[in-house]
């Protein structure tokens, strides 16, 4: 908690301006000072380079400055001349087309391209690279890169934060600099980070809207060299206001400067004036693209009118000309609109959008700030319900509102640093020629930008600098993805492709190389086929080793020459892949792989958690994420090539199974470890990994030697034999599982060699209430550690009954009992149904139903597209959708609205059935399941159901049973399920309306593990 100091706006502005004026004095930047380019922006044929430097003579003080230099950029457009003569009057250049150009040394299709200087009147007119930002072009056409560390070769002076130099253009400016390697750094230079957040008023009956509701406060927090500046602007038309804290504890955080405004329009204008005074490099918000920025500009328009609002909300920095906020419209996977906001002189990152669209963060329960902060920072927000905030504001007690507002800015700043977003962003800039504004762009845009430049600068081979350029016409991808159509044509089939639309000259079938691979025909329907999944053998296993391929798909793409420039159409009507490993994509992947190996090696030479260790680790992790994302590009734009990659992966996994199982009873292993027998059995495999059960006579190895021996056997014999048989491909030992519960594909859990339980695809789904997940995991953990099923189920019953009795006390724990569902205005399912039956009523999902309920009474956060809405079921006589009730509005003490445990018990039923499938039918399942259900339904009036054991029927050969369980996965992987799978159970539970008669059960046998401990 921080103390709040009330200040006048003029006093705060003077204080901040004084700090800025102190830095206007002459500062010398010399060869001993390392600088980092934090951002670049381009306008009117001039490049503005924002830099942060560590001043060696001033104890490495952080100094921010900028340089401005003339910079001519160039674009490309098609030349439609006849080219009858040897030269073109437009001075065009002929490039091989990057997408399916033909076959090297036989025939390649050409594209005639004119390179022209960009100007304001010719910016994107008929431009083939119109999707590039100007800073992308700077990265491609100069040696300057955002995120780059540099030094000036000679000393230069800075006055008013502006670098004085004599460079006439950007190329002279480049010659003034030398690049600094990361290994030469003594201090990391991070951008100065700011975050803002607004709190809005409402009538308590609906969500805030800028046309009707005002802004209560705007908080800003700036982190510069680990020190915070905290400011909160608040609006209250009347005096006085109470900013005294109700807490008696001393403040643990820096003071917050609070400024009282009696006019809301003045407060909004002051916020935009703060940006240049605070001079951050990065401006964060949390859901700002959808809420905060539109609300700020909406209120400014409402209060001032469009003309005055445009002036008040301009973005300024240093003495540069103020500019408008730039918006760009994009779409998510559900075709919902999203407006991104760009602040020109600052890097703007909506942290909510970053987290919710990055697959690295899929394990989060939801993307609300409190959830994210608890997951990554082990911190939580200040709790302030909307109705309490409105009451406090009405009573002019603003201290908690200020504290709440400021904390909502502190957490995103800490998340930005914790998740190392700056390093990931700058690594993308340096490797893929992206700009900092591309951070939130989708993967297809990012890879397209990289391919555009790499195609133009391609060479014959990595070791041969002879130019071999291609031109990447992005619009060819509309054909390869099957999306091209005329404006008056209906949308094509999702899987149909017609590559004849590219109008490529077919290669004579007689000239096709023997090594070329047939991918598809020029016209066909192509569906995506995923990686191989070896049919799991369900059950409980001990001593299981997992082997993983190192970067399987990137390795396949490197060694198979996977690249759009290697694909060609032949005269036999088929499409082929020429395995040229010197193509653009294989060389990119090889570069990424070699860089990652180098940085991992440098990291491992450093002391753990030291400055260099963390620096190298951040870079190698960013390289890994970039390389792994490239495969998905082909799944979007050319499925036949993606299918070839997965086909090769399936073949490799199948090869592993044969080689591993052939090593059973290897004489070398038996002799070295003194064993009479050893059997390797692959019990499961998924895409790039396989599970190997190691069977041996445990009596022949001392208990303290077993784990070490298994590790040595698998690592030094199994892995080595596999890797020695390949060229380029490599497998590594990922883990030794002391015990494993394998349920079905992509669903298992295990006890690792550090005695920690890990879950994959099982008991992790976000829709399962947290209290059930905790109870289920405690049960499974006891089973993995050798406890009996009766002992584990007794623990389950004990915990489930305790959670039932604790429901609603305290109120903050309600979130542990709820479900959640993603909200989308337009889902793909609803779209498909609409196409099938236009007269059909729109589908109202649980999420839509709950959002409508939330919008009416007013809440502090109204879920948008992609947000997960938390809800419970209430005990009313309705269908499931109508039973759903938003958690934010649910009161556990309400006499009229009680919770329904219907869905909770259905989830418990699924869990019990999963355990039966592993451990077989036992009387303890029926006993404990019945006891739990009886307690939970004791006060429920409607939809009470009881567990009944129903005999199972074997699935017919070739058909897989469809089951609607809580953890089911939908995927398109190639499944090796056999026609029949042996089972060790004869019946499973089903929930019925009629309560069954239960047989009395005596005491269960004592748990051997518990007896041994006692």
Swiss-Prot record:
Its EC top class is transferase
Specify whether Nucleotidyltransferase is a keyword of the entry: yes
Cross-referenced Gene3D superfamilies: DNA polymerase family B, C-terminal domain, Helix hairpin bin, Palm domain of DNA polymerase, Ribonuclease H-like superfamily/Ribonuclease H
Reactions accelerated catalytically? DNA(n) + a 2'-deoxyribonucleoside 5'-triphosphate = DNA(n+1) + diphosphate
Return the InterPro entries for the record: DNA-dir_DNA_pol_B (IPR006172), DNA-dir_DNA_pol_B_CS (IPR017964), DNA-dir_DNA_pol_B_exonuc (IPR006133), DNA-dir_DNA_pol_B_multi_dom (IPR006134), DNA/RNA_pol_sf (IPR043502), DNA_pol_B_thumb (IPR042087), DNA_pol_palm_dom_sf (IPR023211), DNA_pol_type-B (IPR050240)
Q: Which domain of life is it from?
A: Viruses
Which stretches does UniProt call biased (Acidic residues)?
967-978
Keyword annotations of the record: DNA replication, DNA-binding, DNA-directed DNA polymerase, Nucleotidyltransferase, Transferase, Viral DNA replication
MF terms in GO: DNA binding; DNA-directed DNA polymerase activity; nucleotide binding
Example GO biological process term?
viral genome replication
SS bond partners: none
The family database entries (SUPFAM superfamilies) matched by this protein are listed as: DNA/RNA polymerases (SSF56672), Ribonuclease H-like (SSF53098)
Question: What's the EC number here?
Answer: 2.7.7.7
Please indicate if the UniProt record lists Nucleotidyltransferase as a keyword. yes
Protein's job: Replicates the viral genome, host DNA polymerases cannot substitute for the viral enzyme in this process.
Family, as annotated: Belongs to the DNA polymerase type-B family.
Q: Know the name of this protein?
A: DNA polymerase
Species classification: Viruses, Viruses incertae sedis, Naldaviricetes, Lefavirales, Baculoviridae
Which gene carries the instructions for this protein? POL
